[in-house]
């Protein structure tokens, strides 16, 4: 399988280039970065692209690869539901290409989201703290937003978080994502980390995941690359590729 990388000279992109080159069953076909022409992908007969670029350019990248029948595995951040709906419309109009967009490709992060969803209905309170390097473009992270959505779905019909706060500085209680408080930390020395804190009478539960370096994303990305040709249309998250039942 011929695999290209968009954002190939970035920190995550360079990690993906090395991973593809090291995989015996994959061929690195093209590395594309800012200033390069996307036609490099078609000229190199790329079959699947890995996109770790920037929210400002990822939609243009996806339009190009979908129009050219190239599958896409996307780890770029900043996907709103409006953007996801737009990508879904594009792939429906061009059924030859499949797209997988994931807020996080680290297997441990995906499992932590799954565990949080399972725990959500058993606790009165829940809050999320996500911690990343200071160069991250979006806040809260896509992983935190996805986690909050999964928790909110699991807590349907339950009372909201108890919170007697009546005065305070704007933002002190975090962002409200589907009724779940989410707190974002940006700090030099961090990579990608998340804590989900649950509380109820007499006990708390903390689910924490840490990506210590960017190679933590490699197994999930390569799994998606190898599976994407068997998927149809748009897939959000790598959960469908894992046996989480």
From Swiss-Prot:
<dbReference type="GO" id="GO:0019877">
    <property type="term" value="P:diaminopimelate biosynthetic process"/>
</dbReference>
<keyword id="KW-0521">NADP</keyword>
<feature type="active site" description="Proton donor/acceptor">
    <location>
        <position position="132"/>
    </location>
</feature>
<feature type="binding site">
    <location>
        <begin position="75"/>
        <end position="77"/>
    </location>
    <ligand>
        <name>NAD(+)</name>
    </ligand>
</feature>
<feature type="binding site">
    <location>
        <position position="133"/>
    </location>
    <ligand>
        <name>(S)-2,3,4,5-tetrahydrodipicolinate</name>
    </ligand>
</feature>
<dbReference type="GO" id="GO:0050661">
    <property type="term" value="F:NADP binding"/>
</dbReference>
<comment type="pathway">
    <text>Amino-acid biosynthesis; L-lysine biosynthesis via DAP pathway; (S)-tetrahydrodipicolinate from L-aspartate: step 4/4.</text>
</comment>
<comment type="function">
    <text>Catalyzes the conversion of 4-hydroxy-tetrahydrodipicolinate (HTPA) to tetrahydrodipicolinate.</text>
</comment>
<keyword id="KW-0220">Diaminopimelate biosynthesis</keyword>
<dbReference type="GO" id="GO:0009089">
    <property type="term" value="P:lysine biosynthetic process via diaminopimelate"/>
</dbReference>
<comment type="similarity">
    <text>Belongs to the DapB family.</text>
</comment>
<dbReference type="InterPro" id="IPR022663">
    <property type="entry name" value="DapB_C"/>
</dbReference>
<feature type="active site" description="Proton donor">
    <location>
        <position position="136"/>
    </location>
</feature>
<keyword id="KW-0028">Amino-acid biosynthesis</keyword>
<dbReference type="InterPro" id="IPR023940">
    <property type="entry name" value="DHDPR_bac"/>
</dbReference>
<dbReference type="InterPro" id="IPR000846">
    <property type="entry name" value="DapB_N"/>
</dbReference>
<dbReference type="Pfam" id="PF01113">
    <property type="entry name" value="DapB_N"/>
</dbReference>
<dbReference type="GO" id="GO:0005829">
    <property type="term" value="C:cytosol"/>
</dbReference>
<feature type="binding site">
    <location>
        <begin position="142"/>
        <end position="143"/>
    </location>
    <ligand>
        <name>(S)-2,3,4,5-tetrahydrodipicolinate</name>
    </ligand>
</feature>
<feature type="binding site">
    <location>
        <begin position="102"/>
        <end position="105"/>
    </location>
    <ligand>
        <name>NAD(+)</name>
    </ligand>
</feature>
<dbReference type="InterPro" id="IPR036291">
    <property type="entry name" value="NAD(P)-bd_dom_sf"/>
</dbReference>
<keyword id="KW-0963">Cytoplasm</keyword>
<keyword id="KW-0560">Oxidoreductase</keyword>
<dbReference type="GO" id="GO:0008839">
    <property type="term" value="F:4-hydroxy-tetrahydrodipicolinate reductase"/>
</dbReference>
<dbReference type="GO" id="GO:0016726">
    <property type="term" value="F:oxidoreductase activity, acting on CH or CH2 groups, NAD or NADP as acceptor"/>
</dbReference>
<keyword id="KW-0520">NAD</keyword>
<dbReference type="InterPro" id="IPR022664">
    <property type="entry name" value="DapB_N_CS"/>
</dbReference>
<keyword id="KW-0457">Lysine biosynthesis</keyword>
<dbReference type="GO" id="GO:0051287">
    <property type="term" value="F:NAD binding"/>
</dbReference>
<protein>
    <recommendedName>
        <fullName>4-hydroxy-tetrahydrodipicolinate reductase</fullName>
        <ecNumber>1.17.1.8</ecNumber>
    </recommendedName>
</protein>
<feature type="binding site">
    <location>
        <begin position="7"/>
        <end position="12"/>
    </location>
    <ligand>
        <name>NAD(+)</name>
    </ligand>
</feature>
<dbReference type="Pfam" id="PF05173">
    <property type="entry name" value="DapB_C"/>
</dbReference>
């Amino acid at each position: 399988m011929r695999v290209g990388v968009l954002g190939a000279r970035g920190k995550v992109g360079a990690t993906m280039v090395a991973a593809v080159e090291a995989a015996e069953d994959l061929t690195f076909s093209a590395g594309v970065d800012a200033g390069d022409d996307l036609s490099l992908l078609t000229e190199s007969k790329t079959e699947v692209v890995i996109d770790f670029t920037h929210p400002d350019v990822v939609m243009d990248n996806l339009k190009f690869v979908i129009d050219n029948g190239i599958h896409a595995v996307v780890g770029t951040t900043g996907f709103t539901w409006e953007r996801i709906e737009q990508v879904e419309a594009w792939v429906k109009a061009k059924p030859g290409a499949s797209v997988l967009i994931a807020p996080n490709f680290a297997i441990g992060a995906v499992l932590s989201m799954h565990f949080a969803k399972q725990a959500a209905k058993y606790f009165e309170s829940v809050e999320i703290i996500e911690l990343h390097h200071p160069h991250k473009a979006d806040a809260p992270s896509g992983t935190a937003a996805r986690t909050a959505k999964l928790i909110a779905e699991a807590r349907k019909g339950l009372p909201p978080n108890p919170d007697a706060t009546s005065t305070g500085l704007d933002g002190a209680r975090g962002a409200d994502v589907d009724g779940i408080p989410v707190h974002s930390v940006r700090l030099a020395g961090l990579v990608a980390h998340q804590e989900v804190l649950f509380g109820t009478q007499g006990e708390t539960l903390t689910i924490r995941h840490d990506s210590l370096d960017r190679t933590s994303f490699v197994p999930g990305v390569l799994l998606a690359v190898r599976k994407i040709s068997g998927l149809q249309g748009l897939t959000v998250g790598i959960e469908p590729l894992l046996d989480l039942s």
